[in-house]
Swiss-Prot record:
Transmembrane segments: none annotated. Belongs to the YajQ family. This is Nucleotide-binding protein VIBHAR_02358. It comes from Vibrio campbellii (strain ATCC BAA-1116). Keywords: Nucleotide-binding. InterPro entries: DUF520 (IPR007551), UPF0234-like_C (IPR035571), UPF0234_N (IPR035570), YajQ-like_sf (IPR036183). The lineage of its organism: Bacteria, Pseudomonadati, Pseudomonadota, Gammaproteobacteria, Vibrionales. GO terms for molecular function: nucleotide binding.
Length: 160
């Protein structure tokens, strides 16, 4: 019976590359000359530091563009509120990985409401979908992509 898994993961190597490229762009941009600004990757969180809140916003946009170039969905970013410490501003950006239980339940409900001949089951931080025909599984993937749940999903472990 054909099946596949729905997961939400981020390639940490690509994330590190995106942060390094964003730091490199900061060093060459004219509006960040003589400004103490940097991106710092700590595990799966990015710490953004700059001298002003406006610069933090610009830096988030720089990071977003480099994530897109590296095929990391920017919807996985969870930006916390900026904090002012002295003359510097800091912001932590966490990257969501895995599918939490409420989202998994919404996903299963979405699949069941689509009235496709597939079964969905929650298995930890992923959802397994099984069906009799490969076409049903592909229709399920299309329905999930249409739904826009705010979390980037990847489809892997496709078995026939």
């Amino acid at each position: 019976m054909p099946s596949f898994d729905i997961v939400s993961e981020i390639d940490t190597v690509e994330l590190r590359n995106a942060v390094d490229n964003a730091n490199r762009e900061l060093s060459t941009r004219f509006d960040f000359r003589n400004v103490n600004a940097s991106f710092e990757l700590v595990e799966e969180n990015v710490k953004v530091s700059a001298e002003g809140e406006f610069q933090l916003k610009q830096m988030r946009d720089i990071l977003r563009s480099h994530l897109a170039k590296r095929n990391i969905d920017a919807n996985a970013m969870d930006a916390k509120n900026p904090e002012a410490t002295g003359k510097n501003w800091h912001q932590n950006i966490a990257f969501r990985q895995g599918i939490d239980t409420p989202t998994a339940k919404k996903l299963v409900k979405l699949i069941k409401d689509a009235k496709l001949k597939v079964q969905a089951s929650i298995q930890g931080d992923k959802v397994r979908v099984t069906g009799k025909k490969r076409d049903d599984l592909q229709a399920t993937i299309a329905a999930i992509r249409e739904a826009e749940m705010g979390i980037p999903f990847q489809y892997n472990n496709f078995r026939d």
